[in-house]
Swiss-Prot record:
Its cofactor is FAD. L-ornithine N(5)-monooxygenase; part of the gene cluster that mediates the biosynthesis of hydroxamate-containing siderophores that play a critical role in virulence. Gibberella zeae produces extracellular coprogen-type siderophores as well as the intracellular siderophore ferricrocin. The role of extracellular siderophores is to supply iron to the fungus during plant infection, and the intracellular ferricrocin is required for intracellular iron distribution and storage with a crucial role in ascus and ascospore development. The keyword Oxidoreductase applies. It comes from Gibberella zeae (strain ATCC MYA-4620 / CBS 123657 / FGSC 9075 / NRRL 31084 / PH-1). It comes from the Eukaryota. Its EC number is 1.14.13.196. Belongs to the lysine N(6)-hydroxylase/L-ornithine N(5)-oxygenase family. NADP(+) binds at A286, G287, Q288, S289, N355, Y356, G357. Residues 54-63 have a biased composition (Basic residues). Gene3D superfamilies: FAD/NAD(P)-binding domain. GO terms for biological process: biosynthetic process; intracellular iron ion homeostasis. Disruption phenotype: Impairs the production of siderophores and leads to slow growth under low iron conditions. Does not affect the ability to infect single, inoculated spikelets, but prevents the spreading from spikelet-to-spikelet through the rachises of wheat spikes. This is L-ornithine N(5)-monooxygenase. Homotetramer.
Amino acid sequence: MSPHSEISFSGSDAAVSNGTSNGINGHSNGTNGFSNGHMNGHSNGNDAPTAVRHGPRVHKERSRHLETAPVDSEFDLICAGFGPASLAVAVAMHDAIAEGRNLRPDGTAPKVLFLEKQPKFAWHAGMLLPGAKMQISFIKDMATLRNPRSEFTFLNYLHSQGRLVDFTNLGTFLPARTEYEDYLRWCSSWFDHVVNYNNEVLSISPENKEAGAVKTFTVQARNGKTGQIQSFRSRHVLVAAGGQPSLPKSLPAKHPRVLHSSQFANYAPQILTKQNAPYRVAVIGAGQSAAEIFNNVQNLYPNSKTYLIMRQEFLRPSDDSPFVNSIFNPEYIDNLWPRSVKARETLLTEARATNYGVVRLELIEHLFEKMYDQKREISDDETQWPHRILSGREIASVDTKGDALEIKVQRVNDGPLDGFVDQETFDVDLIIAATGYKRSAHIDMLKDAWTMLPKTVSGRNESPKGANGWNVETQDGERKLAVARDYRVKFSPGTVADDSGVWLQGCCEGTHGLSDTLLSVLSTRSGEIVQSIFKQ
């Protein structure tokens, strides 16, 4: 989980990491979103710890500016996904109309539909750990930086819950992660009437593309309960599909005792059912999520043995100093966008320490103290410690051994040493991979529109990291899927009508910066997208 991390990763609008996982740790989410409270443990007798529970939500109001429409309507906008990114767009539309702006020429409410694969709104549900706090100011909420007078500010949420004065007395800009998640659910409840939950978008296809400029798109979605596939039509489509968990190839696929970090809080208690049992747990990764889970397991299961396995030699602290943090300012997008592909890649690589493969310093210090205490109290021999950090290691193999998993780890890039490899083997009851996310769902969703994309320029230096788009292979040659500054997909001239199109969110880090996958710019970016779509 990253310090500025903001977009849901267990649903359709997830916070983005940088592509696929990289070896063991995959540079899993860094530290620009949250920090972990160190005193996380509970005591529930011999029962497993339960997930965090929330009090009842009293809010029943709904947006008076966005109205439902029959499913066979031609929608003005369909959003694939309803996590924080799409939620921010709903808020921006509500605010625009509340300010007296017309999003439709006739002044009526726009016909909008959000399609979300989750059964209800959720944000980082698998990482709502006890004691965890945000590491991004509540001012970077759904609205404040765009419109501080909006109904959807975090402060207005506190006021509506009767906690504004008490929160002020905390003297912090950093709410509990669970409270911020409740704020997002409070915001989302205003728009429940225009959201179809349990609907996963499968494809976005242009209609009548042979007849001239495309004016409408067909969006196909599968109902998660019935399996039924339904089609919807819209002039504008926004894709905010989030990230898909990325697991190292060394781990067995779909094994019941192998979880991604996004599943931790929901599923680990179902596997590790007895709090005082001597469970053995391996965590893979070098970022904030990995460090938080490594620490949290020790607190929740006091008799456990834990292993933190990572390719990096050290846990590295995040750089959240104010000058460096300006990379997350909304205006920085305009600084980055005009630069060359090489310049953008260089800058993003330099700035990785703000967000990827890094950990909040206070958590690093806490874990170091734990390691020191073991050395002082048990032995200099780390193999005797119940909690170990295996740095500079990679997984050689994982084999099933009854109800357990046998892990073999070795030094990164180790060659044979006198005929042997420096390898260690141990058994675990659970593996948790905090190894990041892939951000490629939009590519396959738009497959039926690939032939409308411009052809790639022969001889141009193409980036494999999305810094100038994504290359896709068609029967008519290679095409380029890329976006403009306003996040609109750049189709070939004349193929899509000016008042129609497709927009992307949460997968444009290579062109729009590290903030693209984070909460930092949601309020301002959503305003820009609403202006672009509705020609404000």
